[in-house]
Amino acid sequence: MNTEERYEGDLINGMRNGQGKLYYRNGNIKYEGEFANDKFEGTGKFYYTDGNYYIGQFKNGLKHGKGIEYYKNGKKKYEGDYANDKKEGEGKEYDLDGYYYIGQLKNNSFHGKGILYDKNGKIRYDGEYVNGKFEGIGKYYYDDGNYYIGQWKNGLRNGEGVLYFKDGRVIYDGEFVNDKFDGRGKFYEPDGGHYIGQFKNFLKHGRGIEYTSDGKKIYEGDFAYDKKEGEGTCYNEEGSYYIGQIKNDLFNGKGKYYSSNGSVIYEGEFINGKYEGIGKYYYDDGNYYIGQWKNSLRNGEGVLYIQDGRVIYEGEFFDDKFEGNGKYYYLDGKYYIGQFKNFLKHGIGIEYEPNGTKIYEGGFINNKRDGIGKYYNEDGQYYVGQWKDDTSVGKGTVYYQNGNVKYEGDFVNGKFDGYGKFYEENGEYYIGQFKNSLRHGKGTIYFPDGSIKYDGEFVDNIPNIPNIISIKNHICSVK
């Protein structure tokens, strides 16, 4: 017998046997109940130094059998089975926050099947335990009403399981690792849209498919940390779709964009969801463009083709328009090489016949000849001078095929008009006024040697009679 602790009760052969009380050295009671061979045996009450106490069965000095542990305030701490001083078997355990557990225990820990309740008596967890932790199959209820049914390991969701909204709709159905969505799974959005594929650390990661609420595919391909990234196919509501490279949820890299009927709309490079880099675009009328893009607009060098492969335009583009230097081909075979602005010939350029002979070279404004330019007639004659609104106006010169001047002077609406000088092929020439390409007004006709042939008024190219005519040194009056 321990002489350091005081005992009051039955003794047999100098040993505690029967009913008795054992006190701590400070005088506080330690145990009251049955003894056998100096040990707690049978039914008794044991007081812990912290004020908690136990009432129940003992064997060989240890809690063994049925018993109840209490907090010092008298509230129950545990009620159930014991084996060799440990909670083991069926029991009910309470904590100070009001939570309690009903189920199987082993080695002082929840082990086997059991139910954990919150302070309001609502089930928090119903399932299997190993060494005090959720492990095996179990159902857990969250504060917001959502709940999980599935596998657990080491107190965390691990393995296959299903997470539900409180109304029973599925949030996630799949694999878990250390409480997180990890592996293969199916995730449902509140609006009914869902994702089937791989997860990592709660995030879509790996291969997967996104669907609308009615089951139509939105995206199928690679994900990285919850964003579309890698190779994939994106589907639009109207039926068009994209196949290619993706980064940060946007088309990035090489890809193809298709219409709802499966025909290619664009194939080439993308940056942040826009056509950017080198690409080929197919128009509804069969025409197509190959060249540079920026911000989904034609920008830089490119070539526009009609459906049979003939070139319409090749050159520079700015914000989808012909702008800069380029070459434009007309359907009749004629073509233009020069500057453009806002789709129009603007600046310096040259117009050609299909055979490559020049039609016009010079200035253009808003698709019309304007400024200084040179125009070539089919008969070989040509004009050099001022233009406005596609018409020769102002000062200019017309040349014969051999380069000799035919006319130099004023033009109005493409006609000799104003003051000018006209040279006949026989050497004679006229200096004076013109109207509507006819001699009209005051003027003089000269012989090749410079002597005056006629000096006077003209009306619609005809000398105004009567007049004074000077012919070779002979002067006469015409009546």
For the regions a protein language model found, what residue spans apply to each?
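Long terminal segments
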Residues: S451-K479
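Conserved anchor residues at repeat-unit boundaries in beta-strand-based tandem repeats, strongest
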Residues: R6-R16, K30-G42, Y54-K63, K77-E88, ...
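Serine residues within intrinsically disordered or low-complexity segments
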Residues: S260-S263, S392, S470, S477
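Short, surface-exposed secondary-structure junctions/capping segments
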Residues: L96, P190, E237, L331, ...
